[in-house]
Design a protein with these regions (language model features):
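Acidic, His/Gly-rich catalytic cores of divalent-metal-dependent hydrolytic chemistry
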Residues: 163
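Active-site donor-binding loop signature of nucleotide-sugar glycosyltransferases
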Residues: 8, 82, 143, 155-158
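Domain-level recognition of soluble alpha/beta enzyme cores
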Residues: 125-152, 159-160
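Short, flexible micro-motifs
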Residues: 34, 112, 140
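Active-site-proximal alpha-helix that buttresses catalytic centers in soluble enzyme cores
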Residues: 2-90, 94, 122, 126, ...
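Non-DNA-binding regulatory cores of transcription-related proteins
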Residues: 99-106, 111-137
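Charged/polar, solvent-exposed surface patches and flexible loops
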Residues: 29, 94, 98, 116-119, ...
Length: 163
C-alpha cells in the first residue's frame, strides 16, 4: 500500500474570537487554491487514492473534500477521529481496514500529528524522524502493514514543488 499522509491546507491564523471552537476553523481562500493545485498535481503523478480518511475537523475535512473533488473519486472522504489526535496505529488500522497490497490510501490531518504518524511508520517512534511538513504537504510511505518502522519513505512533496 502507498500511504499518502497529507497535512491540511492553510486555514489562516487561529482566532479564538471568530472561532472559539478551533475544530470549526475553515480553510482560507489561499488554502483552497493551494490544495486544488496539489490535488491536480497528484493526478498528474498518478497518485490517486482509492480511499481518503480525514480528521473530522473542518479544515481537514475541507482539504479531503478538495482532493476527492479534483481527482473525481467515487467515494467521499471517511471521517476518522484517530486523525484528530496523537497517532495510535491500532485505531487507524481499525478505520483503514485491509486495503489491497497495491492500494493508494490518503490520510488527511493536522500538525504535529501527521509528522508524528510519519515518524512512527518510518522510524518506530514519534521522535525517531524529524519531518518538516508544510500545509498541503504530501508524505508518501510504502507499507505492507500499518506498524511502527514498517514503512519506506517514497517522497515528501511540498506545494511549491507541485506548481
Amino acid at each position: 500500500m502507498l500511504l499518502l499522509i497529507i497535512r491540511h491546507a492553510d486555514a489562516g491564523d487561529r482566532d479564538p474570537a471568530q472561532w472559539p471552537d478551533d475544530t470549526q476553523r475553515p480553510l482560507s481562500d489561499k488554502g483552497r487554491k493551494t490544495h486544488r493545485r496539489v490535488s491536480r498535481a497528484l493526478g498528474r503523478l498518478e497518485l490517486v487514492p482509492e480511499l481518503v480518511l480525514t480528521s473530522p475537523w473542518i479544515r481537514a475535512a475541507q482539504t479531503a473534500d478538495i482532493l476527492v473533488e479534483e481527482r473525481k473519486l467515487d467515494r467521499p472522504p471517511v471521517p476518522c477521529t484517530a486523525l484528530a489526535d496523537t497517532p495510535e496505529l491500532s485505531r487507524l488500522a481499525d478505520d483503514l481496514g485491509k486495503p489491497p497490497s497495491g492500494a493508494v490510501v490518503a490520510m488527511v490531518g493536522h500538525s504535529p500529528w501527521m509528522e508524528e504518524l510519519g515518524a512512527i511508520l518510518l522510524g518506530g517512534s514519534a521522535t525517531s524522524v524529524r519531518i518538516d511538513f508544510p500545509k498541503s504537504g504530501v508524505l508518501g510511505i510504502d507499507l505492507a502493514e500499518l506498524a511502527p518502522a514498517a514503512g519506506e519513505l517514497r517522497f515528501l512533496l511540498r506545494p511549491k514543488q507541485l506548481s
